[in-house]
């Protein structure tokens, strides 16, 4: 059999298995997730050994290294997320709308699973756990195409999940990890009738490739080109804490700060605002005015002149750009030009500026006086997430349980027929 034949045969098995998930009670699903959470801890050494094999192939300086890395603390966090998903209410069979027509027909619109969800992602083995938990809880089967950089990790995780499913009498076909060959992703993206929806998680290049190649419907979980605008009426102590957190907490994730925009009236505060960043070795690409302001105090090895490409870049590392503006309109224009519509933040005490910013910024998540690091399903109280959708159709922002369902109309009658 060819690779395509093998994959399509397995995808049909996934499709068949997906039809049986709806027969599982929420109680049964929760038991699977709670059992898996316990096994993550007890099987930690096997998972970490597989992860070490992947890490050995990657340079520590690679921005993806931190995303690839698993350790006992991160596995404990994944297990906690698994238990959290189990504790959440089921998103299925929720009545969204209900009415009785003049004909006597009773209509009920209720949430149902999407079916088979495909995920294409890069070197993030934690995604394998997160996606499985969310898809199972929402009644969906899962097809995964992880990055080759994390292949050992993903295979170990999938093997553990399959073992737990079999122990609970559930077909392991509800989770299918595709072969590592690049061709497998193309076969997946063209599997109309087998896969209902594909979600890419990773770089803008990956997302663009999936959007341009897939025949299966796609929901984009976007690269984060994230801005924070420090207004003329900002509290600078607050701004200093927020900027530091947004940039340095986890610089390799999509909600990390990429461009600091500062009002020209507050340029005199820029050196103090950026001082904590230098302690974290953050490289700053500054425009002319901010460069001159930072030059006397910011370490010369960390201060660079900004080039056009430094705006609209998702750095995923300890790098950021600085843009000086004279007005709110100029800040909004810059954001509109370069934003990936992921997360954007404003720091100000001016409520009129806040209202204008909230109204005019086109992004999935818009902040006032808070770090963009909060763009996360768990932080929103949604449990783990599939990703952050930057598009407007079906889902926007953190994609958690509700976003992994669709709906159907159920109509009850008493023999009604429609008149000619």
Curated annotation (Swiss-Prot):
Pathway listed for it?
Amino-acid biosynthesis; L-proline biosynthesis; L-glutamate 5-semialdehyde from L-glutamate: step 2/2
Its localization reads: Cytoplasm
Primary localization: cytoplasm
Identify the species of origin: Chlorobium luteolum (strain DSM 273 / BCRC 81028 / 2530)
Extract the Gene3D superfamilies matched here.
Aldehyde Dehydrogenase, Chain A, domain 1 (3.40.605.10), Aldehyde Dehydrogenase, Chain A, domain 2 (3.40.309.10)
Functional note: Catalyzes the NADPH-dependent reduction of L-glutamate 5-phosphate into L-glutamate 5-semialdehyde and phosphate. The product spontaneously undergoes cyclization to form 1-pyrroline-5-carboxylate.
Query: Which of UniProt's keywords are assigned here?
Result: Amino-acid biosynthesis, Cytoplasm, NADP, Oxidoreductase, Proline biosynthesis
Q: What's the name of the protein?
A: Gamma-glutamyl phosphate reductase
Q: Which reaction does it catalyse?
A: L-glutamate 5-semialdehyde + phosphate + NADP(+) = L-glutamyl 5-phosphate + NADPH + H(+)
One GO CC annotation: cytoplasm
- NCBIfam families tied to this protein: PRK00197.1, proA
NADP as UniProt keyword: yes
Cite the GO molecular-function annotations of the record. glutamate-5-semialdehyde dehydrogenase activity; NADP binding
Which E.C. number(s) belong to this protein? 1.2.1.41
**Which HAMAP family does the record cross-reference, listed alphabetically?**
ProA
Family as reported in the entry's similarity comment: Belongs to the gamma-glutamyl phosphate reductase family.
Instruction: List GO BP terms, alphabetically.
Output: L-proline biosynthetic process
* InterPro entries membership: Ald_DH/histidinol_DH, Ald_DH_C, Ald_DH_N, Aldehyde_DH_dom, G-glutamylP_reductase_CS, Glu-5-SA_DH, GPR_dom
């Amino acid at each position: 059999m060819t690779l395509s034949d093998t994959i399509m045969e397995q995808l049909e098995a996934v499709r068949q298995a997906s039809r049986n998930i709806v027969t599982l009670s929420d109680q049964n699903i929760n038991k699977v997730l709670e059992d898996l959470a316990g096994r993550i801890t007890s099987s930690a050494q096997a998972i970490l050994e597989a992860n070490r094999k992947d890490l050995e192939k990657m340079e520590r300086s690679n921005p993806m290294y931190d995303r690839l890395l698993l350790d006992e603390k991160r596995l404990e966090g994944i297990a906690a997320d698994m238990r959290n998903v189990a504790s959440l209410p089921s998103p299925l069979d929720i009545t969204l709308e209900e009415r009785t027509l003049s004909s006597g027909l009773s209509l009920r619109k209720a949430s149902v699973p999407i079916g088979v969800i495909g995920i294409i992602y890069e070197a993030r083995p934690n995604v394998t756990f997160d996606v499985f938990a969310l898809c199972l809880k929402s009644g969906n089967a899962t097809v995964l195409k992880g990055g080759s950089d994390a292949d050992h990790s993903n295979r170990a995780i999938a093997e553990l999940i399959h073992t737990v499913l079999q122990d609970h009498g559930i077909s392991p076909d509800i989770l299918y990890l595709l072969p590592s060959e690049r061709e497998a992703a193309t076969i997946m993206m063209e599997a109309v009738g087998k896969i209902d929806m594909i979600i890419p998680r990773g770089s803008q290049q990956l997302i663009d490739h999936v959007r341009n190649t897939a025949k299966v419907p796609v929901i984009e979980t976007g690269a984060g080109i994230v801005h924070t605008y420090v207004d003329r009426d900002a509290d600078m102590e607050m701004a200093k804490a927020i900027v530091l957190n947004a940039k340095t907490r986890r610089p390799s994730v999509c909600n990390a700060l990429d461009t600091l925009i500062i009002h020209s009236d507050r340029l005199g505060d820029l050196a103090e605002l950026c001082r904590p960043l230098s302690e974290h070795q953050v490289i700053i690409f500054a425009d002319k005015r901010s460069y001159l302001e930072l030059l006397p105090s910011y370490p010369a090895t960390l201060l660079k002149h900004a080039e056009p490409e430094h705006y609209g870049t998702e750095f995923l590392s300890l790098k950021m750009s600085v843009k000086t503006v004279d007005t709110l309109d100029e800040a909004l224009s810059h954001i509109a030009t370069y934003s990936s519509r992921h997360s954007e933040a404003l720091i100000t005490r001016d409520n009129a500026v806040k209202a204008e910013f909230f109204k005019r910024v086109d992004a999935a998540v818009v902040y006032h006086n808070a770090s963009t690091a909060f763009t996360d399903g768990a932080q929103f109280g949604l449990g783990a997430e599939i990703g952050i959708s930057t598009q407007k159709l079906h889902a926007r922002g953190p994609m958690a349980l509700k976003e992994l369902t669709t709906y159907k109309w159920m109509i009850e009658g008493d023999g009604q027929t429609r008149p000619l």
